[in-house]
């Protein structure tokens, strides 16, 4: 019984991750991301903490110029990339932004090189 419940919870988590990745990749264009909004409306915070009790998801997409952005965010906050209204975000929700830039020689193979920056924002 315990194994089947664990399996169903794991499966539902996988389905939610896939759905979220689909939304980010195919529904939200890169141009909809408003970093100005994020920088001014969300206070800078620490990396996601397990003490918050949030389920963290990761999603990412590639820009046409070779840049890639990857996001991690808490499920309760409904913090999708873009410029979501603050009223839709619960206090304590954090977004972790990781920026990568591909090497010149790796652009055609879509391989990423070094990690450039890691920034974390939390809703106050």
From Swiss-Prot:
Glycans are attached at residue 41. Signal peptide: none annotated. Residues 24-124 are extracellular. It is found in: Membrane. Residues 1-2 are cytoplasmic. Keywords: Glycoprotein, Membrane, Signal-anchor, Transmembrane, Transmembrane helix. The chain crosses the membrane at residues 3-23. One of its GO terms (cellular component) is membrane. It is a single-pass membrane protein. This is Putative transmembrane protein FLJ36131.
